[in-house]
Amino acid sequence: MTLEPFVLPVAGTTVAGLRSTPTAGTRVLALHGWLDNAASFVPLAMALPGLDLVAIDLPGHGHSSHMPPGTQYNTPGAICHVLEVADALGWERFTLLGHSMGAGIASLTAAAAPERVERLIAIEALGGLRGAEDETAQRLREHVRAVRALPSKKLRVFSDLAAPVRARMMANQLSEPCARLLVERGVMPVEGGYSWCSDQRLMLPTAM
């Protein structure tokens, strides 16, 4: 099964992703991990014929819209976004497939809207992150400093695709072909080469 690019208007934003040829098969909405994109599911899709598989770039990732200035990425917002995507697809009930952060969002979406989610498939699920209580104030200070410094932060520019491919291979223990899949969908052309197209706000330290 091959996946083709698509773009979907959702609640005033653009949701991009990859989709199999729509069939009468099981409807599956796939959610990728942190700083990944819909291409995460390309190798898996080859082993899943007969599904109506939609893999989206979550907000701020891949080719999807970034959140508006002055807003931040959070879990409740991600849950609402998943349901809005399903609404835009015309899917009343569907299966959720998630990897890492996407698996965490999928599991919480299933808990928040069990009447919509038929099945939940979680790969390397990532739960909520929690630090020591006595570090709360320090984490908040670090988050605020990072937010205020963000406008002056320069994008990292790669002269070619080889460097970001190597970076993904080292960071995630990926093969070269799998790392290249993610990189080709996860970078944008800029002056001097390429830069990550993911929203820099996704890299902010956790506030609480």
Segments the model singles out, each with a brief description of its role:
Residues 152-207:
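Conserved alpha/beta-hydrolase catalytic His-Asp/Glu region
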Residues 1-28, 49-52, 91-92, 127:
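Alpha/beta-hydrolase fold catalytic core
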